[in-house]
């Protein structure tokens, strides 16, 4: 009997780390639904009577060394560490990213220069990103320190200065824009650094471009669960319904909202899942 566990979750003070090494699926492990009741074939037959019969030692679980608080783990792809914007390009024309590089190892939206995105494309990922809304506070509602983090370049986790700033709840900080209201508003005071830990699984499409499996996303905002494995019903447009264009891997995109948002980002890394 083989080990049925293919995922190890390491809980750290700054996020969730899962082993990158994928384990081959177990051929004889199946779930059967009979009359709307789930039955696990692997647990049918004679039940074990000794503890050793349900203890497994293979396959070995990959070792990932977590970083210190604020640092990337050993198998992460570091997308921004504050030294340059080499991993990023303009979403408008694929030229060099034009956002401001700051002395504190952060970058800030350069108003009206356009969104930026990673040169590398990704599918399923664990994403760590830190962001800050600026002082002094200016404007209100959706115009106050508005940005967004787009998985696959099309599914937005909202970034917004929500402190004493009411707006529509499916567009507030921590929302999956216009799809899922966050479970809590967990922002730190304006001018301090927020952390997002995002677990994203991309949708799947058949050969004809039809969606056969929805994507899903989990978001932890400053240690607080705000999106719990929610279904991505499609893209996250400002106007209209979600759309489901067939796609493969895509970039991570950061939004220039075009209204002097002055949002800053730092310490961005991903782990491919």
Task: Identify what each model region corresponds to.
Residues 1-27:
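Bacterial Sec-dependent N-terminal signal peptides
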Residues 19-273:
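Carbohydrate-interacting regions of secretory-pathway proteins
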């Amino acid at each position: 009997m083989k080990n049925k566990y293919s995922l190890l979750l390491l809980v750290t003070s700054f996020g969730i780390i899962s082993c990158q090494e994928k384990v081959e699926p177990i051929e004889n492990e199946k779930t059967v639904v009979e009359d709307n009741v789930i039955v696990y074939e692997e647990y049918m037959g004679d039940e074990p009577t000794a503890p050793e019969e349900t203890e497994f030692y293979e396959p070995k679980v990959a070792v990932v060394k977590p970083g210190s608080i604020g640092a990337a783990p050993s198998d992460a792809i570091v997308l921004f560490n504050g030294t340059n914007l080499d991993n990023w390009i303009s979403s408008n024309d694929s030229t060099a990213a034009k956002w401001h590089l700051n002395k504190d190892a952060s970058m800030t939206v350069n108003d009206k220069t356009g969104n930026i995105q990673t040169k590398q494309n990704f599918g399923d990922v664990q994403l760590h990103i830190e962001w800050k809304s600026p002082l002094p506070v200016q404007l209100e509602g959706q115009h106050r320190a508005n940005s967004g983090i787009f998985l696959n370049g099309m599914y937005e986790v909202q970034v917004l200065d929500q402190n004493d700033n009411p707006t529509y709840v499916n567009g507030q900080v921590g929302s999956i824009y216009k799809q899922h209201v966050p479970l809590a508003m967990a922002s730190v005071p304006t001018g301090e650094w927020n952390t997002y830990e995002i677990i994203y699984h991309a949708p799947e499409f058949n050969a004809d471009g039809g969606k056969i499996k929805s994507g899903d996303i989990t978001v932890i905002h400053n240690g607080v669960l705000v999106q719990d494995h929610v279904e991505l019903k499609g893209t996250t447009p400002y106007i209209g319904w979600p759309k489901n264009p067939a796609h493969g891997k895509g970039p991570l995109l950061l939004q220039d909202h075009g209204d002097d948002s002055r949002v800053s980002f730092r310490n961005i890394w991903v782990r491919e899942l």
